């Protein structure tokens, strides 16, 4: 069986420059890449917030053509939080812009984090308010997604700010059930799911069970490894698969059992921002081969 592999470049593209980052991904043997709208949308000088943002996209599309490296998925920015008083704020125009941009680059799947409340969620009623806020917020993006034939992919999260305490409800959108409920309550065929394995591990989830629960809705992957959530330290370290504590064989089996048809995308940070170009290519190539090996073992 032939698999397609892609990688994120968000951890190093600002250091190397976009054209060099894409060239390194191509040199490492990947079929496509995950375009980081999140990187190019932050800051007053970011190209996606400029009036001539479409000229930036034309240059990206030309690079894709020259390198024969398509954009298979993209990552939207996460610029909005739920206000403490829960007053509603519509999606920033930039989110609509990113959907249009994804379509222009030939990218069908744009990944979004659910909008979070950066406070402790100590009751089910508070968690329900967060859910209702997200349903309303994402529903406002549906028409744009329909107009540009793009799918909004909802990514599972984790308690990155260590706000939860023992006895509290699970942090919102860390379970397969939460993700499926958000998808269904938004109520559009423009919504799909993205599984981030590192986030799931940081939330102490059974990752294969999440995959089985998402059958038919799972469209994209953020495959990465870590050593689990450690309070007081940054734990979302995005190692290459196989370099942390996650057990990968059951994950690959689950993906094959549900007949996952999407691209196998890794989202590494690891040491990629710190090494030279040659070493970065080597690490990316090794990560791809390791992933390919994990998949081939399921064919035996």
Where are these regions (language model features)?
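Short, conserved active-site loops that position catalytic residues or coordinate cofactors/metal ions
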Residues: 34-43, 72-78, 114-116
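Histidine-acidic metal/acid-base catalytic patches
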Residues: 1-6, 11-31, 92, 106, ...
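Active-site acidic/histidine proton-transfer and metal-coordination neighborhood
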Residues: 58, 62-66, 81-192, 202
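Short, well-ordered beta-to-alpha junction loops that form the rim of enzyme active sites
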Residues: 76, 113-115, 155-158, 197, ...
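Short acidic, glycine/proline-rich loop/turn micro-motifs
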Residues: 44-46, 84-85, 121-124, 163-167, ...
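N-terminal small/glycine-rich loop or linker at the start of catalytic domains
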Residues: 1-8, 72-81, 117-121
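Glycine-rich, proline-tolerant flexible connector loops at the mouths of alpha/beta enzymes
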Residues: 35-59
């Amino acid at each position: 069986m032939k698999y397609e592999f892609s990688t994120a470049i968000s951890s190093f593209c600002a250091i190397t420059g976009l054209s060099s980052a894409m060239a390194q991904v191509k040199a490492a043997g990947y079929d496509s890449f995950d375009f980081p709208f999140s990187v190019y949308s932050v800051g007053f000088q970011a190209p996606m917030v400029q009036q001539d943002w479409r000229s930036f996209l034309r240059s990206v599309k030309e690079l894709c053509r020259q390198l024969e490296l398509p954009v298979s998925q993209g990552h939207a920015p996460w610029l909005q939080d739920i206000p403490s008083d829960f007053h509603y704020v519509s999606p920033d125009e930039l989110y609509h812009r990113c959907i249009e941009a994804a379509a222009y680059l030939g990218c069908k799947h744009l990944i979004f984090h659910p909008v979070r409340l950066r406070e402790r969620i100590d009751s089910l009623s508070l968690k329900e308010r967060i859910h209702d806020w997200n349903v309303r917020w994402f529903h406002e993006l549906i028409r744009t997604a329909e107009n540009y034939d793009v799918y909004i992919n909802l990514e599972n999260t984790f308690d990155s700010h260590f706000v939860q305490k023992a006895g509290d409800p699970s942090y919102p959108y860390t379970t397969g059930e939460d993700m499926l409920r958000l998808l269904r309550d938004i109520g559009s065929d423009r919504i799909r799911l993205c599984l981030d394995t590192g986030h799931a591990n940081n939330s102490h989830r059974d990752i294969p069970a999440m995959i089985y629960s998402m059958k038919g809705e799972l469209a994209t992957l953020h495959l990465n490894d870590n050593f689990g959530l450690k309070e007081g330290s940054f734990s979302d370290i995005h190692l290459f698969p196989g370099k942390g504590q996650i057990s990968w064989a059951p994950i690959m089996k689950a993906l094959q059992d549900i007949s996952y048809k999407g691209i196998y995308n890794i989202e590494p940070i690891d040491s990629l921002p710190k090494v030279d170009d040659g070493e970065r290519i080597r690490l990316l190539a090794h990560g791809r081969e390791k992933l390919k090996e994990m998949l081939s073992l399921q064919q035996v």
